[in-house]
Amino acid sequence: MDYKHFKGKHANIVIEIISLLEKGVKKAQEILEKPDAGSYTKLENSSGDTPIKADLALDKFLEENFLSLENVKSVFSEEKETPVTKENGSYLIAYDPLDGSSVMEANFLVGTIIGVYEKDYKAQNLAASLYVVFGHKIELVVALEEVYRYGFYQNKFHFIETIVLENKGKIIASGGNQKDFSSGLKKALEGFFAENYRLRYSGSMVADVHHVLIKKGGMFSYPQKKLRKLFEVFPLALMVEKAKGEAFYFDKGVKKRLLEQSVESYHEKSECYLASQHEAHILEKYLKGE
């Protein structure tokens, strides 16, 4: 893989992680392709969810690989109660080994989300983020100074494009229970559909955000506090912001950046809006003051 796009203070750790992913992606694909990969275990993770077999197998594989990196001090999986910590290193990795696992049996797109933090697990310390999506093809997206998209072919990641969101998109991925949506959100969604937006929600956050990014605009929303800050929300918020979009939530009717949120507990959850500029403006218009 050509690493010419990666520059600055955190470039080396990102390159090391990508190198691990490039070497391990075939193994990860093998785990996902096993006939019983989507079968539920009898366990319960720290978030109260029941993981599938592929969740646990990928988690073990990724943890071992991330801990092998010399400059990584701590590794923290969504499946675990607390991080695994080493004596040395500067970086902390928080990851969701298999986002979208609940729809994997339907053969929908799933992926691994990775947040690279410096010194502490805080949004303000997020140095970079990455995700790999597994479908009929495998792709890697990296957020550092900008957002870079790669396709996996002949055992290597090949550069496809630098992703920059346009001002206005054409798709929306609106998750959650609609009966619980606020009146403002319902009006905003009605307005989007009146403008001929297309609904593209799959139940896999990484897949839906990937769709918004590669289509160069749109909106992903999950108004209920269900998504985990460290493992899903912050890494994908950074991805959207670096692509010139907005990542936000509403606090008593006031729009605020997701990446300025505090973290009171490791598995704390948040509402989440990820959008290009036009959609962000519309959402603020209707949800402001609610």
Swiss-Prot record:
Subcellular location per the Swiss-Prot or TrEMBL entry: Cytoplasm
Taxonomic placement: Bacteria, Pseudomonadati, Campylobacterota, Epsilonproteobacteria, Campylobacterales
One GO process term, biological-process aspect: fructose metabolic process
InterPro entries: FBPase_C_dom, FBPase_class-1, FBPase_N, SBPase
Documented EC number(s): 3.1.3.11
Primary location class: cytoplasm
EC top class named in words: hydrolase
Gene giving rise to this polypeptide: fbp
Residues at which Mg(2+) 2 binds: D96, D99, E232
Sites where the protein binds substrate: D99, G100, S101, S102, Y201, K226
Record key words, sorted: Carbohydrate metabolism, Cytoplasm, Hydrolase, Magnesium, Metal-binding
Stored Pfam families: FBPase, FBPase_C
Family to which this protein belongs: Belongs to the FBPase class 1 family.
Note on how the cofactor is bound: Binds 2 magnesium ions per subunit.
Organism: Helicobacter pylori (strain Shi470)
Annotated Mg(2+) 1 binding sites: E78, D96, L98
Gene Ontology MF terms in the entry: fructose 1,6-bisphosphate 1-phosphatase activity; magnesium ion binding
Highest taxon in the source lineage: Bacteria
Cofactors that this protein relies on: Mg(2+)
Keyword Magnesium: yes
GO cellular component terms, A-Z: cytosol
Protein name: Fructose-1,6-bisphosphatase class 1
Pathway: Carbohydrate biosynthesis; gluconeogenesis
Reactions catalysed according to its record: beta-D-fructose 1,6-bisphosphate + H2O = beta-D-fructose 6-phosphate + phosphate
Quaternary structure, from the entry: Homotetramer.
